Design a protein with these regions (language model features):
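Hydrophobic structural segments
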Residues: 1-265
Length: 265
């Protein structure tokens, strides 16, 4: 039988490492431990979303008599304040409790972390050395930026490289070619941050990478003279949870796995 790690020890470390209490988020978003268990964990499962498919996937991997893994996600269950545990929410929480699986969520705290954050890790995978931060959200800077490396010498090459590092099909990343053919200063805010194009422009960037954005951002990009690449909300947020799980696995000597449930969005 595996020797489990006390849940409270891992949670205390994560809360401090990710600055859970210090980083602001949406008004009713809950970051940190969302569902507790009986006290021991035997591994780590990372995922983007705490969906029913994700939870069912974790349950399918459980070994009888072994301590369960902790489920680490970017998009947790608790976003909208005090609401009844009914319907879909009840079914997901009940499945976690029935199988003693704890759930830990980190939204904005994971996006902005300088080591395992979605933005920082994507920059690293693209070969971009982070030189600064931009994009104000409730008093903190959301995005990272740096100069384009030689491997990203054209705006088209950025879209192709995003498909490669995010393991998406060629052509998945959408390029809005509003800026220069040869990028110089590239910014990144993963997820659904298309409305931050203005912040990227104000920071003097000529190319902006995000997951997705509303229709009008096409014209924003073309008329403001900035390249925008949308590489998928889900895809751009797969890297942070994996980096976080890898970091925890090494620190606490736990095996970890990533459960991939792409949405195509």
């Amino acid at each position: 039988m595996k020797v489990g790690v006390p849940l409270h020890e891992l949670v205390a470390y994560l809360d401090e490492y990710l600055r859970i209490k210090q980083i602001p988020d949406e008004a009713n978003a809950v970051n940190g431990l969302q569902v507790e268990n009986s006290g021991q964990i035997g591994g780590i499962v990372a995922a983007v979303d705490a969906s029913q498919a994700t939870i069912d996937g974790v349950i399918a991997t459980l070994e009888p008599g072994e301590p369960p893994p902790i489920l680490l996600v970017h998009h947790g269950l608790l976003w909208d304040g005090n609401v009844p545990l009914t319907g879909r929410r009840y079914r997901r929480v009940a499945a976690l409790l029935d199988h003693d699986i704890p759930l830990y969520a980190a939204h904005i705290p994971l996006d902005v972390h300088p080591e395992v954050g979605n933005n920082a890790v994507l920059a690293e995978r693209l070969g971009i050395r982070v030189e600064g931060w931009f994009g104000s959200y409730r008093g903190i800077a959301m995005g990272v930026w740096g100069h384009a490396p030689a491997s990203l010498s054209t705006r088209e090459s950025i879209a192709l490289e995003l498909d490669r590092v995010l393991h998406t099909l060629k052509g998945s990343a959408t390029l809005i070619p509003g800026g220069p053919e040869r990028p110089a200063r590239i910014g990144i805010i993963t997820g659904g941050a298309g409305n931050m194009i203005g912040e990227a422009r104000a920071a003097g960037l000529d190319t902006y990478i995000s997951g997705e954005g509303p229709h009008h951002t096409y014209f924003d990009a073309m008329e403001w003279g900035i390249n925008v690449v949308y590489a998928g909300h889900y895809a751009t947020e797969t890297l942070g949870v994996q980096a976080m799980a890898s970091h925890l696995g090494e620190r606490f000597n736990l095996e970890w796995d990533f459960h991939d449930h792409p949405t195509g969005l």
